[in-house]
Amino acid sequence: DVGLRNAQLNFRQQEENHIMENIIYNELLIRGFNVDVGAVEHSERNENGKVVRRRLEVDFVCNRGNQRYYIQSAFAIPDSSKMQQEQKSLVHIGDSFKKIIVVRDRIKLWRNEEGIVVMGIMDFLLNPNSLEL
């Protein structure tokens, strides 16, 4: 709960990105999902040309019955490099379940070239069917 977190920290840290993640997490629980943090193994070449394995985090892996969604929480995506960073873990998931990035800004829901849905937090919260869009 965001209020309990803030009280525990004596209202010293107002990290909006963590608060947004907490809000998304609580909403997913309210909607009846089992929610976990996910990780994806990915190999890439470093600046020396050596192949290195990286572990990429998925903020939320949401399961309810036979439904599964992968969700990234991104406070802001000001440019294409930030978009690549946020979607990197999602594009390396080897299944066809829906992948979603939720951002703080009010934006029109859209689907990028990787098939990832990008939506604003208000659309996510106010529409109980937002994950189906």
What is the predicted function of each stretch?
Residues D1-L133:
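A cross-kingdom feature that marks ATP-driven nucleic-acid transaction machinery
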